[in-house]
Amino acid sequence: MYNHRWKTAARIFVTAWFLIGGVMHFVNPEPFVRIMPPYIPFHLACVYISGAFELAGAIGLWIKPLRNLAGYGLMVLTAVVTLANIHMYQHPDLFPNIPEWLLLVRFPVQAILIWLIWWCSRPEKTATVKP
């Protein structure tokens, strides 16, 4: 029961993170376009697609038959977003309003987020009765 509450809290946090982020991909896509590495084509389309996947994953975390799949999808998406974080860290001059230390902190935050996604999307363990 105690573990269930923490998992639910983690799922709420992850859902909020991706719902807000996903909506912002459509409401204000420009910042997301700006952080994309130049070697990735179709920046705006990628922003819209990733926003849609963020929204779908956030919703999927609350649908039990889809929870595991949604978790894997959000983990992959978060890992792919790391490409933008690497680009930002390698080119801090392109992002003068963001302190360099904050660009670096994004990497452990991404790792923690991936772990949270994994943990909150795993099935609950049920007690088994031995005969």
Which role fits each region the language model picked out?
Residues 1-131:
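Membrane-interface extramembranous regions
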